Structures are given as structure tokens and as C-alpha cells.
Regions:
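Short, small-residue-biased leader/transition segments that mark boundaries at the very start
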Residues: 1-5
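Transmembrane alpha-helix/helix-exit interface in multi-pass inner-membrane proteins
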Residues: 8-28, 69
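Cytosolic/stromal cytosol-facing helical appendages immediately following the last transmembrane segment
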Residues: 24-153
Length: 153
């Protein structure tokens, strides 16, 4: 049960911190370092300003709120550090053989690096769908994003 709570907290924490990092002042001083990788690869996942590292890994504080085993906190840190590489590979599917493939959510984060204004979170909790920042790569979603960005600016 604690692992499930931790995973949902991590998803929410990532989305909220990521949105915060896209505020103009935070983007300029910290998050722009990460977004130099417009076509990201696994090693670019932790290419961040030190301020962003502090914010990104601050999610481990949940283990002081919901008392948990030290292995849970260790898993949390490993997942945050190593799991982010998987989120930056940019592939939509992993091919099993000629006829089978597994859908990945990594493509969504690739679109985030391409357009900056979409897909701040992952697909486990649909924050992007709820707040109108989701982009699936389709022409319709691209038009919706352009309209939203033009209103914002």
C-alpha cells in the first residue's frame, strides 16, 4: 500500500515541480539547462541545474511524512534517478517482434522537449488531460496547443 501511495505521490510531485520549473523565472535560471536537449536521449534525463536537482529529488521527503522502510526511500531515489532515463528515450513503442509492440509513454515526454508547453507529467495520473496541456502527437492536439499558447502570449 505504501508503495502505491509513494508512486502516486511521485507522479503528482513530478507534475507540480515540472510545471513550477516552467514558470518564466524558474525556466530562465534553472530548467532551461535541461531543455537544451530538444531531442533528448537517456543521458540527458539528469542534465539539470543544481536547483532543479534539489526540487526533482525533494519528492523523497514523502518518506518522512508517511513513515516507511528505508528500502522504500532508496527505491524512490533509484526510480527517480534511473527511471528518468527511460522517460527520455523518445520512442513511442518498443518492438517485441514483427507483429507485437509495447506502447510506451516516453513519446509524450519527447513531445514535451519538442514543444515545451505540453506533457509536463506522465500518464499514470492524467494531470495534462485535466489541465489542458496534453499532446499526443496528432494534428488536432497540435492545433489545440498552438491556440492555447497564442492565448497565453
Amino acid at each position: 500500500r505504501q508503495m502505491c501511495i509513494r508512486d502516486r505521490f511521485r507522479d503528482a510531485h513530478f507534475y507540480l515541480i515540472h510545471r513550477f520549473l516552467h514558470f518564466k523565472f524558474m525556466y530562465k535560471i534553472a530548467h532551461s539547462v535541461h531543455h537544451r536537449n530538444v531531442n533528448p536521449g537517456p543521458w540527458s534525463s539528469l542534465s539539470m541545474h543544481p536547483i532543479e536537482h534539489l526540487l526533482y529529488f525533494s519528492g523523497v521527503i514523502i518518506h518522512w511524512v508517511i513513515l516507511s522502510h528505508p528500502l522504500h526511500a532508496t527505491y524512490h531515489l533509484f526510480h527517480a534517478g534511473l527511471g528518468s532515463a527511460n522517460g527520455h528515450i523518445g520512442f513511442k513503442q518498443m518492438m517485441i517482434n514483427d507483429k507485437r509492440a509495447i506502447d510506451l509513454s516516453n513519446y509524450n515526454h519527447y513531445l514535451h522537449h519538442k514543444y515545451f508547453e505540453v506533457n509536463y507529467g506522465n500518464l499514470m495520473i492524467p494531470f495534462d488531460q485535466w489541465f489542458g496541456t496534453y499532446h499526443d502527437g496528432s494534428k488536432e492536439m497540435h492545433e489545440k496547443m498552438l491556440k492555447r499558447v497564442s492565448i497565453k502570449n
